[in-house]
Every structure is written in C-alpha cells, then in structure tokens.
C-alpha cells in the first residue's frame, strides 16, 4: 500500500469515528488567504459555516494560529471551536486565554526584544507586531 493510500485509509477510518476524532487546522494560509498585513485577513463565510458544521460532528475542532488567541477567535468567531494562539503558547479555555507555563519565563525577554525591534526597525518601515508571548 502506498503512503498516500494508507493516509487516506486512516482519514476515512477517523471520519467514521467522530466521537473520538479531533480536527485541527491552521488559520492563516489555510482557512484565511495570506494577505499583505494581518488586519486584512479574513476567513470566508463558507469556511466558517463548514467549521460550525464539523464542530457539531467531531469531538474537537481547533484553530491554530501564530496570532494572539483573541485575534484567532475574532477571525473565526465560533464558540464551538477551540483556539490555540501564538504558535501554541496560548489556549482559549472557558473564555480565558491561558499562556502555557513553559513560556512564562521568556515573556519579559520577548517584550524587551519586541521593543528593541520596534525602536530599530519601525523607522525603516518594518511592521513590528506585539503579540504578548511572541512578536512578529
């Protein structure tokens, strides 16, 4: 059996067991097209509807993003979806954003580096985005 055929067989089997299956997807570049600046990003309505429908079927549906978790929620806007932000450093749980404990020791240094990048690069036209536990 080819790798591709084996992968399709596994996917088919998982689709037949929705009560134990999670569907996880990246947001930017997968659900939302890549755009010049983050504020221009948008998840098409038909994909939001698709996420809503599959969230009713599968055990877990999650959106994963390099954005802040709140920004990922704003892009999709569905309470039934679990949101992981900042490349997995954050999770939206019960309406609250939690930063994973392993990331907390680095928070102060990330903020220092973000400030330094903004100070040195913004005057040259670079866009520096503060995202809490990360920066871009």
Predicted regions and their residues:
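Non-catalytic pre-domain segments flanking phosphatase-related domains
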Residues: 1-27, 46
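Active-site loop/short helix in cyclic nucleotide turnover domains
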Residues: 35-36
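Active-site phosphate-binding/coordination module
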Residues: 42-133
């Amino acid at each position: 059996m080819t790798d591709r055929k084996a992968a399709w067989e596994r996917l088919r089997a998982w689709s037949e067991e929705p009560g134990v299956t999670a569907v996880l997807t990246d947001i930017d570049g997968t659900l939302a097209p890549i755009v010049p600046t983050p504020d221009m990003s948008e998840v098409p309505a038909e994909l939001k509807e698709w996420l809503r429908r599959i969230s009713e079927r599968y055990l877990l549906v999650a959106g994963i993003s390099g954005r802040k978790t709140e920004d990922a929620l704003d892009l999709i806007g569905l309470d039934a979806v679990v949101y992981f932000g900042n490349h997995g450093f954050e999770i939206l749980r019960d309406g609250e954003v939690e930063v994973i404990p392993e990331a907390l020791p680095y928070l102060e240094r990330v903020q220092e580096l973000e400030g330094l990048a903004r100070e040195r690069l913004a005057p040259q036209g670079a866009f520096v985005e503060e995202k809490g536990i990360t920066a871009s």
